[in-house]
Amino acid sequence: MSNQDFYATLGVARTATDDEIKKAYRKLAMKYHPDRNPDNKEAEEKFKEVQKAYETLSDKEKRAMYDQYGHAAFEGGGQGGFGGFGGFGGAQGFDFGDIFSQMFGGGSGRAQPDYQGEDVQVGIEITLEEAAKGVKKRINIPTYEACDVCNGSGAKPGTSPETCPTCKGSGTVHIQQAIFRMQQTCPTCHGAGKHIKEPCVKCRGAGRNKAVKTVEVNIPAGIDDGQRIRLSGEGGPGMHGAPAGDLYVTVRIRAHKIFQRDGLDLHCELPISFATAALGGELEVPTLDGKVKLTVPKETQTGRRMRVKGKGVKSLRSSATGDLYCHIVVETPVNLTDRQKELLEEFERISTGLENQTPRKKSFLDKLRDLFD
């Protein structure tokens, strides 16, 4: 038995609860299981270490002994007084298959390496218009499919998997550790109860090969940037007939040239001429549904916010719809003709002294006078 600390092996504190230990074990067992890491000796060793740690820490009496005596509790020359624990053999032995049955829906205590497929996470980029109105997208995801040479059996065509010679088909073996007799997953067949003597040359005994699957994603109207869509059963395929995992699609919304989104509302800048700002007028403004008319009142200043009701984004969870807010920017004309310059100069002359026509300028001058008086 390895002398590595069992708690460190599972990555839990010494005060960890039974549920925390079980959760940590499940995660590591799935990560390092030989079926998921074929021909990976390092993963196989890690899997064995995780097994040993869980076999001890999942049993209250064994855990108590380990907490008190460490690894010496399971060695022949350990502390005295352990004879009373001889009952760990036989029916009270550790059944490694139980935990896998709970994890993956197996039946009896026999170890069942039927792993639910992994969840798959992918991202997709859509336009603001698509996010506002909803859209269907087709995406390609990496997956596995049954081997077309062996039809998923993993065995060379013309042959069949044989009963495992090590466990005789039970999927488990018994090992003796000092005074303890424990049951664990068969190291030869990894709990399947069968052994492939002549593996398929294409899938090398796995029964499946890498593939690409096309999935249609229904993106609902009103979805926001960063939200996820879950497609049940569209993730990685299960092993040996277990259910597939789920597919999680994270939505990213491409930056728009005109609009910025804030929840259900949209915002945009609306440039207007200084003549329209002074006299008022009617303008066409863009929305996600096309152009609409907007009346600009006279004497409008830069920074004024005008609302176009109901031209925002539809709510994902209710019948509400946001609004469009146009932020006015009064533009100073450039590249003036001589005639335009003459008219502006004339306008400036006849406006001199009419401070009530420029309230912000008057307020600024009043503040200057107060500052220096």
Swiss-Prot record:
Its cofactor is Zn(2+). GO terms for biological process: chaperone cofactor-dependent protein refolding; DNA replication; protein refolding; response to heat. GO terms for cellular component: cytoplasm. Keywords: Chaperone, Cytoplasm, DNA replication, Metal-binding, Repeat, Stress response, Zinc, Zinc-finger. Participates actively in the response to hyperosmotic and heat shock by preventing the aggregation of stress-denatured proteins and by disaggregating proteins, also in an autonomous, DnaK-independent fashion. Unfolded proteins bind initially to DnaJ; upon interaction with the DnaJ-bound protein, DnaK hydrolyzes its bound ATP, resulting in the formation of a stable complex. GrpE releases ADP from DnaK; ATP binding to DnaK triggers the release of the substrate protein, thus completing the reaction cycle. Homodimer. Zn(2+) 1 binds at C147, C150, C200, C203. CXXCXGXG motif repeats lie at residues 147-154, 164-171, 186-193, 200-207. This is Chaperone protein DnaJ. One of its GO terms (molecular function) is heat shock protein binding. Binds 2 Zn(2+) ions per monomer. PROSITE patterns: DNAJ_1, DNAJ_2, ZF_CR. It comes from Neisseria meningitidis serogroup B (strain ATCC BAA-335 / MC58). The J domain is necessary and sufficient to stimulate DnaK ATPase activity. Zinc center 1 plays an important role in the autonomous, DnaK-independent chaperone activity of DnaJ. Zinc center 2 is essential for interaction with DnaK and for DnaJ activity. Residues 5-70 form the J domain.
